[in-house]
Amino acid sequence: MNQLCVERNLSISTAYIKSKPKKYIERIKKKKSSNKSIKSQHKFEGSKIANKNNELKDIKSKDPKHYENHINKNTKHKDILLKSKRSDNFKFSRRGFILSFTGNLEDFYNLSEEPLGKGTYGCVYKATDKLLKIQRAVKVVSKKKLKNIPRFRQEIDIMKNLDHPNVIKLLETFEDEEQIYLIMDLCTGGELFDKIIKKGSFVEMYASFIMKQIFSVLNYLHIRNICHRDIKPENFLFYDKSTESLIKIIDFGLAAYFNDIDYEMKTKAGTPYYVAPQVLTGCYDYKCDLWSAGVLFYIILCGYPPFYGESDHEILSMVKKGKYNFKGKEWNNISEEAKDLIKRCLTIDSGKRINASEALKHPWFKKKKGSFNLDVKMDIHVLENFKNYALLLKLQKLAMTIIAQQSNDYDLQQLKTVFLYLDEDGKGNITKNQLKKGLENSGLKLPQNFDVLLDQIDSDGSGRIDYTEFLAAALDRKHLSKKLIYCAFRVFDVDNDGEITTAELAHILYNGNKKGSITQKDVNQVKKMIQEVDKNNDGKIDFYEFCEMMKLKY
């Protein structure tokens, strides 16, 4: 693993979050008592903001009109504070928060007896965190069955780099002597394949809802020089059972990086019905994913594949010829625009084949406006959350990012919809101009020092606002449950002894995200971050202090 592997101590975790033995309760009471007599030398701007938000909620419930006036009244004060952030160039990457551990997985998770499904390298099980009772999905891979360990490591590396609403989230990994475990977000809505079987085919409106997500995620992957190489309905899961559930792409076991020069890949990979002709020759590029998407598109409109046969050999023979038609009665009511988009995906010559970005701009999507094209508005509370986030302490920002990463999509449904609406070009992140346009279209007045605000939201300094960055900044504090607070604390507390040290925080912040070794300047910055919230001045942060920092009662 790229990240440091450590042993996790279950007994300490249980003491903090579940059973709380007497000695730990006494320890916490002692800390609370001592904290009262300590005059903190550090002001918590984030804490002030949290208290101010509680006042605003009361005002909003009693007098909505007065609420907006009250918001505007506080804007000048926050704008002044934002000016002081102009010189703050603190940047970090969420990749460092996806840790790898050694030890017995079943000390931390209860696994279901029956697998949810099978992937390229192993089975996926439903799992429940023993302490937090949060449900996850766990991919279990036997080391003995791994024929190509470097390729599997690449799958993990690829997943750590991805941050998109339509990509399954990797949360952490475990490893013991026999197996490797990938802990991921749990999808409960079933496979796209199963829905196709159940419905037979989709109407064009719903098909546009599905295909826009598929082309968007392919555009996101291809921009990052990643080719999935196994696009098929079995590799898309519905997040939940709702009618407008988003889909998530899974199983990056066959995914590969390609270079910017010739784009060529040579390993034969894929599934017969969906594989592109060039893959069969052993010389192809990233547009093999577009061919597969075209096949999938064809299937969801009519219920059967464009290339079929009694055996894999017959199917592949049909694929090589690339001949298909729209002659069945199922196609009588399908628009010419839909057929044209399929043709552009199923073009034999990959050089002339449409790419994902071009597909998203196809007239069919403009004609069949699906759920992504709804007139989404951001309310003033989202803008206030942006301002509040920009004024947080560094460690608070790190914690909010982890909380956004660990939260399930049920809690973030509205924000997720807003993000997808703002992502007009389907790149999986939004530009500062797109966010500005979204705020203006929602009738919200842009604050002074808006560029400073955007720079604070762009936590990795990429110039664009990624999905988790947006969620962390827009997330309402009402989602800060003790479970989510502990999820963040557990990431920082690498050895699980109940305290966050300078070494642990430096490891999380810089390991895997920094070229070269950690400098003294880096260490000093981490020490300062700890000092800002270390109320008893012992040089460490315990869970009580962490909760105080996030303004959640322990």
Curated annotation (Swiss-Prot):
Protein localization: Cytoplasm
Free-text disruption phenotype from the record: In the mosquito midgut, the number of oocysts are reduced which is caused by a failure of ookinetes to migrate to and transverse midgut epithelium. Abnormal motility of ookinetes, characterized by frequent flexing, bending, twirling, pendular motions and a failure to disperse. However, another study shows no defect in ookinete motility. Development and morphology of ookinetes are normal. Sporozoite motility and infectivity are normal. When injected directly into the mosquito haemocoel, thus bypassing the requirement to transverse the midgut epithelium, ookinetes mature normally into oocysts.
Domain EF-hand span(s) in chain numbering: 410-445, 448-479, 480-515, 521-554
Regulation: Activated by calcium. Upon calcium binding to the EF-hand domain 2, the C-terminus of the junction domain (J domain) undergoes a conformational change which results in the dissociation of the pseudo-substrate inhibitory motif from the catalytic domain. This, in turn, may facilitate the autophosphorylation of the activation loop at Thr-271, which leads to the kinase activation.
Chain residues that bind Ca(2+) 1: 458, 460, 462, 464, 469
Binding site for Ca(2+) 2: 493, 495, 497, 499, 504
Keywords: ATP-binding, Calcium, Cytoplasm, Kinase, Magnesium, Metal-binding, Nucleotide-binding, Repeat, Serine/threonine-protein kinase, Transferase
Residues annotated as the enzyme's active site: 230
Pfam family name, one: Pkinase
Gene Ontology cellular-component annotations: cytoplasm
Short sequence motif named J domain EF-hand interaction motif, residue ranges: 394-403
GO BP annotation list: positive regulation of cell migration; positive regulation of cell motility
GO molecular function, one term: calcium ion binding
Similarity annotation: Belongs to the protein kinase superfamily. Ser/Thr protein kinase family. CDPK subfamily.
Comment field on protein domains: The EF-hand domain 1 cannot bind calcium due to the presence of a Lys instead of an Asp at position 427 and a Gln instead of a Glu at position 434 preventing calcium binding. The EF-hand domains 3 and 4 probably bind calcium constitutively when calcium levels are low, while the EF-hand domain 2 binds calcium following an increase in calcium levels. The junction domain (J domain) is composed of 2 motifs that maintain the kinase inactive. The N-terminal autoinhibitory motif acts as a pseudosubstrate inhibiting the catalytic domain while the C-terminal motif binds the EF-hand domains.
Function: Calcium-dependent protein kinase which acts as a sensor and effector of intracellular Ca(2+) levels probably in part downstream of cGMP-activated PKG kinase. In the mosquito midgut, regulates the gliding motility of the ookinete which is essential for the ookinete to invade the midgut epithelium. However, another study showed that while required for ookinete invasion of the midgut epithelium, is not required for ookinete gliding motility.
Protein name, per record: Calcium-dependent protein kinase 3
Organism (species): Plasmodium berghei (strain Anka)
Organism lineage string: Eukaryota, Sar, Alveolata, Apicomplexa, Aconoidasida
Underlying gene: CDPK3
